[in-house]
Structure formats: C-alpha cells, structure tokens
C-alpha cells in the first residue's frame, strides 16, 4: 500500500502538478487524487537502472506529435494504470516526459511474477512499439533528467518515513512477543542479550524519527535538497533492514512464519533498499555533496 501511494502521489501526481499543462492537470489530478484513476511511473529499463540517464526509450518527432519506442521495467502499478508518466529521449537526446494512456495502440504491459518481495504490489514491464501521441501528451514544464530525478526526490522522502514505520512495527511486535515468551522460567525479554537488542533497535528508530522529522520541517520551509533526502533514504532503509532482521531473530522459529510481520517487512525492505536509488548510489550522491567531486557520470 505504501508503494502504491508513493507512486500515485510522488511519481505521477507530482510531475503532472509540477510540469504539466493546465489541461493535463484538469484531466488527471482530480481522479488520481480521489483514487478513481491509477498511475505509474516509467523510468527504469531492462538495461538502465542506476544509470537512468542512459535510457534507450526514444520519442521521435512526427509532425505535430511524437512516436515513442522502448520498454520500462519494474514498474509499480504498470498493468492497472490508467496513465503512465514515461520518460524518453527526443531527437536531440534530451529527456522528456509523456503521459501515455491505457489502451493506446502499441502500448502494453505485462506483470512480473515469482517475486519474494512486495508480493502484494503489482510490478510490471511496459512496452511501447510505435506509440503515437500528440504533443499535448508531453509534459511541457521540464526537460532533461531534472524531471524524473525531482520526482524521485519526493518518493525517496516518503520512503524514509515508510521505513521508520516498518522498523517501529518490527520493534513493537518483537517486544510484545519477548515479554510473553518464556524460556528457563522467565520471559526472554528479561535476559541481558535480548534487552541489548531492544536498546539498539529503539536507539536506531529514534535516530530515524529525528532525521525524517528534521527533513519534514525543512521540506515545509522549502530548504530541503536532494542530498539530504538521499541521506535519509540511505540511512533509514539500512536501519530498518537491521531492525527487521533483529526482530525476526527474537521471534525465533515463529519469526519465519507469516503470523508475525517482521519476516514480511524484511522481505519487502529488500526491494525498497534497491529501488528509488540503491544504497551505493545514495552513498555516492552524498559523497559528491561532501567533497564537490563526482564519483560517477
């Protein structure tokens, strides 16, 4: 559900609101906001993940419109989306955003099966074969990688908060269990090793909460930048991953069943740890901000 809401708000409604025409906003935003319409975001490709700027999807001029060819991979809500925000390179190699509608000739989607993570979330591949769209389908307010990257900043901000919630649930679930589960005549919460684990978990959760709270206040003030968001996404995903693992351990054998939430969170965090920028990419984004020297293209 968090992934669904993140895509709908940060990756679909945001670019339409920030970069769309008046007509595009009036057509799509009310329905998307009410949940009557579903959107998806097409940036990642089979051969271009972290290096999204190398995308192979093209948008060629064709009279007053465009012809779009290419494919997008790992797209949340892809097969159920009424509208897709698709990023493609034009004849001058400039990245532009387009709104593709469900049912357009040459536009199709297929679901990806066999996932062990985000199993409740629809993940799809998008295919565009000579999809003809009018110029009115183009997002007029942006060009270049600034467009999709600014969307990712919004989504990463939400992820930092979402991981805080995952971590808190894992902690609370494990704590309740540890107080009730008795071994050697007393609750396992009464042992020093277990208490040390809870101390570390709660300290990390508090750090996560303080980071996103500070980030939220900066966002409200208009002073938040993408480097800071990268730090929060990187930090909170890593901490949530550690906390989910520790919570699973405290639950013992019961922890590998779906009766308890940490194993589900642990599996889902593996996806979140990767999407919207890997741990390594965020490390380099922060490193560039610190040193002023880019370690990547």
Regions found by a protein language model. Give the residues of each.
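Helix-loop "lid/cap" segments that line or gate small-molecule binding pockets
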Residues: 10-18
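A short, Trp-centered hydrophobic/proline-enriched beta-strand micro-motif
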Residues: 35-43
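Flexible, small-/acidic-enriched active-site or ligand-binding loops
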Residues: 54, 103-132
């Amino acid at each position: 559900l968090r992934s669904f809401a993140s895509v709908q708000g940060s990756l679909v409604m945001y670019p339409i609101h920030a970069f769309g025409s008046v007509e595009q906003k009036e057509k799509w935003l009310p329905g998307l906001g009410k949940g009557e319409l579903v959107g998806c975001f097409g940036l990642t490709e089979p051969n271009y993940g972290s290096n999204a700027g190398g995308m192979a999807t093209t948008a060629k001029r064709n009279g007053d419109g465009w012809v779009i060819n290419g494919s997008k991979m790992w797209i949340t809500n892809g097969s159920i989306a009424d509208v897709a925000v698709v990023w493609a390179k034009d004849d001058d190699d400039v990245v532009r955003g387009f709104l593709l509608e469900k049912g357009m000739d040459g536009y199709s989607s297929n679901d990806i099966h066999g996932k062990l993570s985000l199993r409740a979330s629809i993940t799809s591949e998008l295919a565009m074969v000579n999809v003809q769209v009018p110029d009115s389908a183009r997002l007029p307010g942006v060009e270049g990688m600034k467009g999709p990257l600014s969307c990712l900043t919004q989504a990463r901000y939400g992820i930092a908060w979402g991981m805080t919630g995952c971590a808190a649930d894992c902690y609370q679930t494990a704590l309740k269990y540890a107080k009730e589960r008795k071994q050697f005549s007393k609750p396992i919460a009464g042992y020093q090793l277990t208490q040390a684990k809870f101390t570390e978990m709660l300290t990390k959760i508090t750090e996560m909460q303080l980071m996103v709270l500070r980030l939220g206040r900066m966002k409200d003030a208009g002073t938040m930048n993408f480097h800071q968001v990268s730090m929060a996404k990187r930090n909170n995903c890593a901490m949530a991953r550690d906390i989910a693992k520790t919570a699973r351990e405290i639950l013992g054998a019961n922890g590998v069943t779906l009766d308890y939430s940490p194993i589900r969170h642990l599996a889902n965090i593996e996806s979140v740890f990767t999407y919207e920028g890997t741990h390594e990419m965020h490390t380099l984004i922060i490193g560039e901000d610190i040193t002023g020297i880019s370690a990547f293209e």
